């Protein structure tokens, strides 16, 4: 009898409190980068009923209105009325931002930009798989798209009873490395008190789930759990506190690949937690796009103040067409994984980070300057050099 494996990933909406915090942190980063491309930013956010608290270290020549940025971001997410439990115009904004330690700065800054050191030690992973068109794992890809659809319908007013907070979870059945069926779907969305559970469940099924998930993967045995606890009126920061960097698996590969532990939002590109994670996604995606492997996980590590990575390693899960040593040689030849090299290679000194802070950092397109790490412009030369 053939054996199947199940794998589950989740996503959350832009109105989830942790994602609110991420978006606020990245909105502040973007505002600073519009004035000062050489700023050092590490901005953390806490949201809870009636308050937004900012903490972290920022060194910049930019002069920004932090409070206004916070309020505009909260309102833009959809929390703009007291009936929702949180109002961007009336919430308290507590600013505890300071400056970056000069001891860190001396290890990062260099007279020659090429020798810019890593902002911290750490390890980062990048991953790609040919199981979806965007070379992402199917469970997280579909979970993100469910949340994007919820947001689109809410913002367009097509389902006017939708509120900003929501979560989705998708379980895929795999035959080897190939997803063959959706085993279970969980979707919970905040809503106005006026909507009945029966009407909500029907609308979510017809307008979100069936519009997003491939019909060929749904079957008679697929299980659906739509707002399984019943009412979900109280949500956002009223229901739960939110913190920057608490959705690192949602932000990346839904658990399908390993994670080095560092979060992304609120960090400028000198922080390799963010920039190097983007870089190794770029590496892995181009390797898979080139047909060198069907699945590829790349790990890179750094020492604080040192430009060159302390290690580069890969796992192709037995799907490689050339040896792993040959693949690593190609990586070293075609990708500059020093911090400054990454920033230049991916054009990361751009105010484009807020759009990455919800619905995942990978497998997406955005503005012209965003998601440069999703390009497959190295695939052709990698394939040629691999002799494929």
UniProtKB/Swiss-Prot annotation:
Enzyme Commission identifier(s): 2.5.1.6
Enzyme kind, highest EC tier: transferase
Pathway: Amino-acid biosynthesis; S-adenosyl-L-methionine biosynthesis; S-adenosyl-L-methionine from L-methionine: step 1/1
Binding site for K(+): 44
Binding-site residues for ATP, renumbered to this chain: 16, 165-167, 231-232, 240, 246-247, 263, 267
UniProt binding sites for Mg(2+): 18
Top-level taxonomic group: Bacteria
Name of one Pfam family that matches: S-AdoMet_synt_N
Sequence segments annotated as region (Flexible loop): 100-110
Cofactor note: Binds 2 divalent ions per subunit.
Alphabetic keyword roster: ATP-binding, Cytoplasm, Magnesium, Metal-binding, Nucleotide-binding, One-carbon metabolism, Potassium, Transferase
Listed GO biological process terms: one-carbon metabolic process; S-adenosylmethionine biosynthetic process
Swiss-Prot/TrEMBL catalytic activity: L-methionine + ATP + H2O = S-adenosyl-L-methionine + phosphate + diphosphate
Compartments where located: Cytoplasm
Subunit architecture: Homotetramer; dimer of dimers.
Record's protein name: S-adenosylmethionine synthase
Native species: Psychrobacter cryohalolentis (strain ATCC BAA-1226 / DSM 17306 / VKM B-2378 / K5)
Source organism phylogeny: Bacteria, Pseudomonadati, Pseudomonadota, Gammaproteobacteria, Moraxellales
